[in-house]
């Protein structure tokens, strides 16, 4: 393998999402990059970097990276090519400077997307009732089968992680319009203010990596002295209780000592660019 620079000029890039079937023109979007402090960039086929969206939330950390308080901001991005939606997740400061989670859906050109967002739809009401904390905030998102999965850290409150009436420490599933999915395991009605309507799986500490493969949901959950990789099954409690040992519960693989995974992807067996021994595998970024 060889590492090379594909595009540059980013400030604290935090997530990336590739257009599944990009256009052929030099100015057609190829992939999107989020910057931690609040800009969404789009890179075109000719490797020009454009600003797709900015100034859609307020955040002024007490200290900049590598300080703990500087870890907060724009965290995840996922694409819905059928509808031309670009979803981004982030933590922001409200009018009282309280840190909260949120998600915004940007409307773009279906299929190939566009260089600028046409409009924006915030999903604030789903998340606004519960404050969050630096680093244990909302995480990545993933579009699958006309639904959107999104992870949330426990906000440094392990008791809320295992409470299905809290959004913290969860994998959530919603429609592209931000509504609950009726087949979610704890769904009771369409009330967007009831966290249990959205819960797919629970009992996580800081699930900052997410990938859906053939309908199976995989998560890397950052722990105290160890991390875990697992399949997040529908309705299952992953038992984070504030202790080191609980991170190993229900894990498919334990990473010890902790490395703090921040991104994850899966390379399918059907793609032949990688050598055969590297296909059909997950890749975690630490």
Model region roles, listed by residue range:
Residues 1-2, 47-52, 106-124, 179-196, ...:
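Beta-strand initiation motifs
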Residues 1-159, 209-212, 216-222, 227-229, ...:
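Acidic, Gly/Ser/Thr-rich repeat motifs that build Ca2+-stabilized beta-propeller blades
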Residues 100-114, 164-177, 231-234:
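Beta-propeller blade signature
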Residues 142-148, 174-182:
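A structural motif
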Residues 157-160, 194-201, 208, 247-255:
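Active-site rim elements
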Residues 157-166, 237:
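Acidic/polar, solvent-exposed loop segments in beta-strand-rich repeat domains
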Residues 165-174, 183-214, 218:
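Loop-centered beta-sheet repeat module
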Residues 235-236, 280:
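Glycine-centered loop/turn motifs
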């Amino acid at each position: 393998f060889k590492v090379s620079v594909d595009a540059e000029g980013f400030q604290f890039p935090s997530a990336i999402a590739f257009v599944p079937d990009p256009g052929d023109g030099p100015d057609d979007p190829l992939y999107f990059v989020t910057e931690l402090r609040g800009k969404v960039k789009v890179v075109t086929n000719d490797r020009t970097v454009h600003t797709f969206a900015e100034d859609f939330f307020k955040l002024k950390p007490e200290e900049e990276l590598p300080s703990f308080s500087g870890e907060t901001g724009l965290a995840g991005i996922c694409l819905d090519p059928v509808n031309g939606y670009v979803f981004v997740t982030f933590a922001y400061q409200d009018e009282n400077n309280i840190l909260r989670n949120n998600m915004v859906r940007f409307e773009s050109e279906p299929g190939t997307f566009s260089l600028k967002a046409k409009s924006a739809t915030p999903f604030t009401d789903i998340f606004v009732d519960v404050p969050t904390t630096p680093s244990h905030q909302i995480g990545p998102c993933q579009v699958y089968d006309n639904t959107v999965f999104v992870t949330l850290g426990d906000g440094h409150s392990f008791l809320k992680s295992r409470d299905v009436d809290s959004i913290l420490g969860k994998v959530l599933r919603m429609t592209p319009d931000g509504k609950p999915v009726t087949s979610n395991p704890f769904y009771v009605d369409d009330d967007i203010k009831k966290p249990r309507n959205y819960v797919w799986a629970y009992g996580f500490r800081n699930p900052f990596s997410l990938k859906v493969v053939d309908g199976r949901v995989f998560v890397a959950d950052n722990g105290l002295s160890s991390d875990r990789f697992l399949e997040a099954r529908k309705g299952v409690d992953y038992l984070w209780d504030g202790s080191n040992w609980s991170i190993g519960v229900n894990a498919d693989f334990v990473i010890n000592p902790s490395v703090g995974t921040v991104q994850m992807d899966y390379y399918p067996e059907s793609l032949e660019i990688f050598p055969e021994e590297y296909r059909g595998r997950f890749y975690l970024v630490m």
